[in-house]
């Protein structure tokens, strides 16, 4: 209905951990080496917004970009989890757009947080699909 806003399927995540250069094609596209270890970074809570919310451009931004990602939504606390058991902790999956301001990210001492943590830089959803409903390794994105 008109005037109704669809929010993110996970409203207030305790943590939003992202993996940088997680697609070989994207690493090559940016001219960077394919990492041998995951490059982890955080997005802040105010990055999360609904799938149809406006993305707010930061002041002086001129190189906005986005990447389609799959979000793994954890369903229970995970600490010292064996690799073979890791998927048992996943409650479900959602679509996420990892929004970036590339000049802030790359030209300011390579600080990913500066380019990836602005308000609304993590549109999420619209749906959360339960872990038993799909095989995340068999998705076209």
Segments (PLM) and residue ranges:
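Anion-binding (especially nucleotide phosphate/pyrophosphate-binding) glycine-rich loop
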Residues: 1-14
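Glycine-enriched loop-and-adjacent helix/strand subsegments that border the catalytic/binding cleft
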Residues: 13-141
